[in-house]
Amino acid sequence: MENFPIINLEKLNGSERADTMEMIKDACENWGFFELVNHGIPHEVMDTVEKMTKGHYKKCMEQRFKELVASKGLEAVQAEVTDLDWESTFFLRHLPVSNICEVPDLDDQYREVMRDFAKRLEKLAEELLDLLCENLGLEKGYLKKIFYGTKGPNFGSKVSNYPPCPKPDLIKGLRAHTDAGGIILLFQDDKVTGLQLLKDGQWIDVPPMRLSIVVNLGDQLEVITNGKYKSVMHRVITQTDGTRMSLASFYNPGSDAVIFPAPTLVEKEAEESKAIYPKFVFDDYMKLYAGLKFQAKEPRFEAMIKAMETVKSDPVATA
């Protein structure tokens, strides 16, 4: 089995830059995931984020989760549960407008810590998009520009805890799916495992590594790269011991951003393939995704192509 790709970003600044860029390229083409070390976010910042996130769960969310489990009788299930996930979550929106001040039960220090962490993640996400541009032969800033729309990108964090589960064989922490958006940066627990990705028909553990950032590609990057890079199915399995922390931050296109395969990539591959992905407004894709998240991505792409063809054939729409 191949080793999960681990990228040392510091090596971009020295003689190993070319090799490091090749590792990123291979990870994007063959894994859809990679793990970053020496990514530039200070360790003390991440330590504080982890400590405060785990403290917030214990103080504000753990008892609520236990009550939810009891109300649904989940500890006594005898068959696989397919309609919910064993996770305790809340969401923070950073861009285009932050909602951190509006989220209940966060103390002021935690709000400030998460606001600072989000700014650092935003910067890292944009740096990574430019590295992808470089590997793809696109002009610097191309992906950021496509994501921008008229109001800027959407950027938010899903803060999750996965408590111990008495029936890990029957209940997933998070059911298998691909991510709808752009590029996702994950700060995960380094002691309790759970995240897996699907590669060559096998579920592979994403190794927990202290103070690393796991990166994965969403559906929009698959479309823009005309399939050169792929979004990959992944899931979270539950454990009988330990609570797993997960902070997934999604750097996505703006709601009105128009997403389509990059013309230069379609031209480069014209002899082998044509543009096989639709052109659509990101918000339209998200509306479709909302009801089909835990299904294969291909029917979503096909539905967007059909919607596009319907618009083209509508004489009113084309007048």
Curated annotation (Swiss-Prot):
Picking any one GO biological process from the record gives: response to molecule of fungal origin
What does the record say about induction? Up-regulated during the early stage of hypersensitive response.
Q: Which InterPro entries match?
A: DIOX_N, IPNS-like_FE2OG_OXY, IPNS-like_sf, Oxoglu/Fe-dep_dioxygenase_dom, Plant_2OG-oxidoreductases
The UniProt entry, under PROSITE patterns, shows:
FE2OG_OXY (PS51471)
Q: Which Pfam families match?
A: 2OG-FeII_Oxy, DIOX_N
Instruction: Detail which positions bind Fe cation.
Output: H177, D179, H234
Gene3D superfamilies recorded for this chain? B-lactam Antibiotic, Isopenicillin N Synthase, Chain
Q: What is its EC number?
A: 1.14.17.4
Q: Which UniProt keywords apply?
A: Ethylene biosynthesis, Iron, Metal-binding, Oxidoreductase, Plant defense, Vitamin C
Q: Please name the top-level EC class of this enzyme.
A: oxidoreductase
What pathway does this protein act in?
A: Alkene biosynthesis; ethylene biosynthesis via S-adenosyl-L-methionine; ethylene from S-adenosyl-L-methionine: step 2/2
- Which molecular function GO terms apply here? 1-aminocyclopropane-1-carboxylate oxidase activity; 2-oxoglutarate-dependent dioxygenase activity; L-ascorbic acid binding; metal ion binding
Fe2OG dioxygenase domain location, by residue? 152-253
Catalysed reaction(s) here are:
1-aminocyclopropane-1-carboxylate + L-ascorbate + O2 = ethene + L-dehydroascorbate + hydrogen cyanide + CO2 + 2 H2O
Please give the cofactor(s) recorded in the UniProt entry for this protein: Fe cation
Write out the similarity annotation: Belongs to the iron/ascorbate-dependent oxidoreductase family.
**What is the name of the protein in this document?**
1-aminocyclopropane-1-carboxylate oxidase
From which lineage does this chain's organism come?
Eukaryota, Viridiplantae, Streptophyta, Embryophyta, Tracheophyta
Query: By which gene is this protein encoded?
Result: ACO
